[in-house]
């Protein structure tokens, strides 16, 4: 039984609605519009909202949306066919009113579709009871067939040619063992007395003849080669003198006194740092203002300059033919027209480090958006699809919620409490380093920071954060801010409960008047249940204002797995009624990937959370805010 069925325009006018079991369809339909239609996530034609499953169909020619809702515990096999039938009948019956495409005509139009809909619903329900014999799904219809081609996968190991040769050798050995030449040594056809021809049952290909000639050569000259190889090995020098180790600029020293960190330390203001290290670690640029991410390179500037120069080789005739080539006319797009272009776009996205499943969903969303749409006069299919994909990518990188830390910190100051930020992520992604960058950015904006060392698992984690605190304190001494200490470290050593340390740090910050508390947590893999339980406990007990997931820009499919499992673990291990999930993303090591920026798309698409910061280097000033248009331009670059 259906809960509701509604037809509305993309402008928001409800043309017709059928109310079944549900009292109102406003809430589910509004959730569909906010979460799917406006966010360009139409790759799948179904959407789940609370206890309902919504299926929808877009009519891009007349700018209509058809939505049906039913209980998600039900399996209604006729829903897809029902939407197609209703779409076809409604469009044909009210074509005149719809073609005017004006709000006044749609408001004045009378869409009496109740009897027709009930008739179609009755027919679909009766036809679903008569079950047709089930047929096996073809490989082309499976999910595996939709995944990228094998040519996009770079495998390590032996080359394909070598594998083909080995398989041919194995096949030839089997044939020789089964035939009349099954002896200890491979004997050529000429010596065996049997002519190589089909009449004697021996048909040799060109590859087999070459292989047999090679075996004869190895049998004759193999012993000499083995002796020569042994002699060359024995003549080699035994061992050279050891190379002197290279001394790096910031490599430190190996003195025992310098490396001894076992002395007891106390919380509070850190010691002063050497000035030469400070000048190197700060970097250049304004620290208090986040600059937009710039993904352009020198190659892009050269191509832009070359494109701006007029080409003297092309004449008026070539320009006329180019104009006629782009002349397509008012054509309605179909899936067959877009199939080849979408395949190329999907492979291009995967090559730029977008996760394979997300690339498929993006292309499917673009196909649903453009199917039935009338193209412009001078537009081609490729340009239309590319423009629609660019618009979808920009929309994905601009999610619903925008995180403004400075505004939220000022709001927390008015309530006389510290603003708490928790960093989480897998091992080695740069949580502590980017925590220090964000600390420097906050210090440049005049906020005092308390760093809570809650990584009690990794050896050297507390010393790592202490080093950053010492350098940040040297960059912002108390004299620079008229007395008060701007940055301090709160730590309780190793092996303690991280949730308890974070709670004590927040209480200490409230008593001492700190503006921000940055909580550094231990790196953990997404499948490590004990550590994920400890992270969920830390977030549930302390209720931070912001939970940031730190991820690398180097990963592809792994980004989706990490974010999905982190959110799932936080929800499963949380003791709260409404579990706290990830609020934002910090994308690190962005300076190492050139134009393969697909991880930004994968992370934002799978979580619908914004990328708050982007790490672009190893100094404190190497922190950027995400520029969606620059990322999309780098992603679409050939």
Curated annotation (Swiss-Prot):
Alphabetized GO MF terms = ATP hydrolysis activity; GTP binding; GTPase activity; signal recognition particle binding
Which Gene Ontology cellular component annotation is one that this UniProt entry carries? signal recognition particle receptor complex
Which positions does the record annotate as the modified residue Phosphothreonine?
Answer: 284, 578
Q: Which GO terms describe its biological process?
A: intracellular protein transport; protein targeting to ER; SRP-dependent cotranslational protein targeting to membrane
The record describes its membrane topology as: Peripheral membrane protein
Domain annotation text?
Answer: The NG domain, also named G domain, is a special guanosine triphosphatase (GTPase) domain, which forms a guanosine 5'-triphosphate (GTP)-dependent complex with a homologous NG domain in the signal recognition particle (SRP) complex subunit SRP54. The two NG domains undergo cooperative rearrangements upon their assembly, which culminate in the reciprocal activation of the GTPase activity of one another. GTPase induced rearrangement of SR drives SRP-mediated cotranslational protein translocation into the ER.
What role does this protein play? Answer: Component of the SRP (signal recognition particle) receptor. Ensures, in conjunction with the signal recognition particle, the correct targeting of the nascent secretory proteins to the endoplasmic reticulum membrane system. Forms a guanosine 5'-triphosphate (GTP)-dependent complex with the SRP subunit SRP54. SRP receptor compaction and GTPase rearrangement drive SRP-mediated cotranslational protein translocation into the ER.
The name of this protein is Signal recognition particle receptor subunit alpha
